[in-house]
Amino acid sequence: MNVVVMGAQWGDEGKGKIVDYLAQDAKYVCRFAGGANAGHTIVVDGKKYALHQVPSGILYPGKTVFLGSGMVIDPEALFAELKMLSDNGIDWEGRVFISDRAHIVLPGYREMDKKRDAARKRPIGTTGRGIGTTYSQKSERDGIRLADLDWEEKMNDVDQADKDFLAPYMERLLSMRIDIAAKMWEIRNENILFEGAQGAMLDIDSGTYPYVSSGASGSYGASSGSGIGPRNLDKIYGVFKAYETRVGNGPMPTEFNADS
C-alpha cells in the first residue's frame, strides 16, 4: 500500500508525529520534495531528533528511506544530519538512498538566495539555504543532479569552488544514488510511506504565490518525486492543526496586525 502524508496548511502541522506513527507499518519511507529548509522533529524515548532531509522512518531499525527526485540535496547539511544520527546510536548505513534525479544545493546558491530575496520590493522571507535558487537552476536546466556527479563532460562546466565543495562527499553520494522509479517498481508490492514537507498552502502551484516554497508540497509531489503514478497512491492524509501558523511573509486569514 502507498500512503502519502502531507501538510494541509502552511507547514508545522505536526506531520512528523503522524509520519512517525504510520512508519511502524511501512517497510519504506520516501521524502518526495523540499530540502534542508523544512524538517520534522521526532521524540523517541525522550530523545529529540530534528530531521531536515532524512525521512523520519530512519529512526526505525530495518526501515529503508529514500530522498526523492523532487528534493534538493545539501550535502553538507545531509551528512551533518547523518552524523548526528550515528552519534545517537542510529545505524543508517545501507538504509538511506537518494534519487539520481535529485538536484544538489551548491554553496553559491545560498548567498544568491539571500541577495535575491533582499533585492525584492516585497521580500518573500526565504530561509537563505539556497533552496529556491537550486529549484530555479533546475527549471533553467542548469542544475547539477546526483546523476551528473560522475559525468565528466558535465562536471567540467562546474566551477572549481563547487567541485572542491563536492569532493569530500562525492564517493558517499554516489554510493547512495539510485534510480528511484526503477526501485519503486521493484518494491511495488510493499508498504511505502511518502513523507511530505511544508504544506499545501506553500505549494509552488496551489499555494499563496509568491509567498510559497519552490517545491511540490502537494500530494502530487509524491508521484513526481518517486515515479509512482497518482492512481497508485492508495491513501492521502492531510494534516491540520487547530490553530494556523505560518513562517515567513505572506497572507494568513486569521492573522492579527496593528490595523485589526
Where are these predicted regions, by residue range?
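Non-transmembrane, aqueous-exposed alpha-helical and coiled segments at domain scale
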Residues: 1-260
